[in-house]
Every structure is written in C-alpha cells, then in structure tokens.
Amino acid sequence: MTSFAQTLRNNATVPERILWSRLRGRQLGGFKFRRQRPIGPYICDFVCLSEKVIVELDGSQHVSEAGYDARRDAVLRSNGYRILRFWNEDVTRHLDTVLETIHAALFQGDMDGRFD
C-alpha cells in the first residue's frame, strides 16, 4: 500500500499538484496535511491527521464510482474522519473557494460531504 501511495504522489494530477502547492508546509492555517496517505485499506488524496479531515478530488470517473466512494467514505467516517469532496474543476477554476471551505472545515466539526 505504501509503495502504491508513493506512485500516486509521483504521478499527481494537475489539480492535485495545484492544491498540494497550497496545503503543503502548513500554509493553510498552520495545519499539516499529507498527500496520498494510506488510512486503513484506502489511500486518501489529502489528510490533516490532527483534525481528521480528508480532502478528496474527484474527476469525471467518479460519477461511475459513486457506490465505491459511498462505501469508502462510510468506513472512513466510522473511524472519525470527515471527508470533503471537490471536483477537479473546482480546484482549477475556484481554488480560493476550495481553500476557504477546507479552512472552515478545520475549525467546524460538522462540515462533511461534497462541495460543488
């Protein structure tokens, strides 16, 4: 699992690279994020372990994977994580809004789900 996570880190999509450039190094409110981090049997795009907030970026393929994503999210939520999902296009077109939403979620324990 760890070597696959490393492969994903080395082959990040453009939206993943854009978002990582703004999350890395505690740039967002001083919170530490990790990318392509294994949590249980899943690899999460980005996670702030201290706040148990997972950020997932979804491309067009996720429309057909909605059932898998729902099961995956349920397992992660049952372990205390909150999942924020954004479309890749949101990162490339509305990065500031995505960052504001993530920042707010780090301080508000009830934010969870898809943000369109």
Describe the residue ranges of each PLM region.
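Basic, amphipathic alpha-helical patches used to engage nucleic acids or provide basic targeting signals
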Residues: 7-13, 37-108
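Solvent-exposed, charged helical/coil patches
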Residues: 1-32, 78, 107-116
